[in-house]
């Protein structure tokens, strides 16, 4: 699943091609994604200019004068920029939506169709008030995210520290891959109860989350199965994993074999020596 780095890489890749440009038309080939695409979306967006593209957690927010269309990549979604002059590229089986601009097509592809394309009209209020966004935690690169915040919000909680990271109620965008990698950098075992982690260790974890996500964005994200950036290129951060998907291999720091456990039906990887 695309996590925050992959979504941010996508945002940075597509914004120069769509920001300030007029949507000439929209072609919806598959209206039934995770939720139905609004039937009048193509009519609503025709002739509108995209003001900017922002990210909130794993959601991409495209602002026009009348509101925002929201894109979530789900498990296997990608957004690619394709040149359609002089000849538009043919759509493949899993290419569900095209936003067509003067020279480029923004194409949404999603083999498993767990993603979403939604509409939030301006009269409904700020887009951050949308039900899918209103309850999200803080952004990991914002000043609001800190070890003190995590420490305060986890007091008395028995859920594991990894599950607390994944929940998205404290900090957004940290999925399974980057939770495992961040906990390794912070030296914290993923099964440790969130309420038992000290403030000092949460300070280390907050720094580790920021460092891990920034490094992943710099490498274009992780490509394990489906993810490619807006230009069709794969990310390379998976080559730098310390623990994720490395069960049985030696720790890059101490040489101890990496262990794999299951938490909440997801695989978790850690070094039993470096993480305590």
UniProtKB/Swiss-Prot annotation:
Its cofactor is Zn(2+). Keywords: DNA damage, DNA repair, DNA-binding, Glycosidase, Hydrolase, Lyase, Metal-binding, Multifunctional enzyme, Zinc, Zinc-finger. Its EC number is 3.2.2.23, 4.2.99.18. DNA binds at residues 94, 112, 157. GO terms for molecular function: 8-oxo-7,8-dihydroguanine DNA N-glycosylase activity; class I DNA-(apurinic or apyrimidinic site) endonuclease activity; damaged DNA binding; zinc ion binding. GO terms for biological process: base-excision repair. The active site is at 2 (schiff-base intermediate with dna), 3 (proton donor), 58 (proton donor), 266 (proton donor). A zinc finger (FPG-type) spans 242-276. SMART domains: Fapy_DNA_glyco (SM00898), H2TH (SM01232). It comes from the Bacteria. InterPro entries: DNA_glyclase/AP_lyase_DNA-bd, DNA_glyclase_Znf_dom_DNA_BS, Formamido-pyr_DNA_Glyclase, FPG_cat, MutM-like_N-ter, Ribosomal_uS13-like_H2TH, Znf_DNA_glyclase/AP_lyase, Znf_FPG/IleRS. Binds 1 zinc ion per subunit. The keyword Secreted does not apply. It catalyses: Hydrolysis of DNA containing ring-opened 7-methylguanine residues, releasing 2,6-diamino-4-hydroxy-5-(N-methyl)formamidopyrimidine; 2'-deoxyribonucleotide-(2'-deoxyribose 5'-phosphate)-2'-deoxyribonucleotide-DNA = a 3'-end 2'-deoxyribonucleotide-(2,3-dehydro-2,3-deoxyribose 5'-phosphate)-DNA + a 5'-end 5'-phospho-2'-deoxyribonucleoside-DNA + H(+). Belongs to the FPG family. PANTHER family: FORMAMIDOPYRIMIDINE-DNA GLYCOSYLASE (PTHR22993:SF9). Monomer. Involved in base excision repair of DNA damaged by oxidation or by mutagenic agents. Acts as a DNA glycosylase that recognizes and removes damaged bases. Has a preference for oxidized purines, such as 7,8-dihydro-8-oxoguanine (8-oxoG). Has AP (apurinic/apyrimidinic) lyase activity and introduces nicks in the DNA strand. Cleaves the DNA backbone by beta-delta elimination to generate a single-strand break at the site of the removed base with both 3'- and 5'-phosphates. HAMAP family: Fapy_DNA_glycosyl. NCBIfam families: fpg (TIGR00577), PRK01103.1 (NF002211). This is Formamidopyrimidine-DNA glycosylase. It comes from Paraburkholderia xenovorans (strain LB400).
């Amino acid at each position: 699943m695309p996590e925050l780095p992959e979504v941010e890489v996508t945002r940075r890749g597509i914004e120069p091609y769509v920001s300030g440009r007029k949507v000439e038309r929209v072609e919806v080939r598959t209206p039934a994604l995770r939720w139905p695409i609004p039937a009048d979306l193509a009519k609503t967006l025709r002739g509108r200019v995209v003001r900017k593209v922002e990210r909130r957690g794993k959601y991409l927010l495209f602002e026009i004068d009348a509101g925002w269309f929201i894109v979530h990549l789900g498990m296997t979604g990608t957004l690619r920029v394709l040149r359609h002059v002089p000849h538009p590229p043919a759509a493949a089986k899993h290419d569900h939506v095209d936003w067509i601009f003067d020279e480029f097509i923004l194409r949404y592809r999603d083999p498993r169709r767990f993603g979403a394309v939604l509409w939030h009209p301006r009269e409904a209020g700020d887009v951050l008030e949308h039900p899918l966004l209103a309850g999200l935690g803080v952004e990991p690169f914002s000043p609001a995210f800190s070890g003190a915040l995590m420490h305060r919000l986890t007091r008395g909680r028995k859920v594991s520290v990894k599950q607390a990271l994944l929940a998205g109620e404290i900090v957004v965008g940290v999925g399974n891959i980057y939770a495992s990698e961040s906990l390794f950098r912070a030296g914290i075992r993923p099964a440790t109860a969130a309420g038992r982690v000290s403030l000092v260790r949460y300070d280390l974890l907050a720094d580790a989350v920021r460092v891990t996500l920034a490094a992943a964005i710099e490498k274009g994200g992780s490509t394990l199965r489906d993810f490619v950036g807006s230009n069709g290129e794969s990310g390379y951060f998976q080559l730098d994993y310390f623990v994720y998907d490395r069960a049985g291999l030696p720790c890059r720091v101490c040489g101890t074999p990496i262990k794999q456990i299951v938490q909440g039906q997801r695989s978790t990887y850690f070094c039993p020596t470096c993480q305590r």
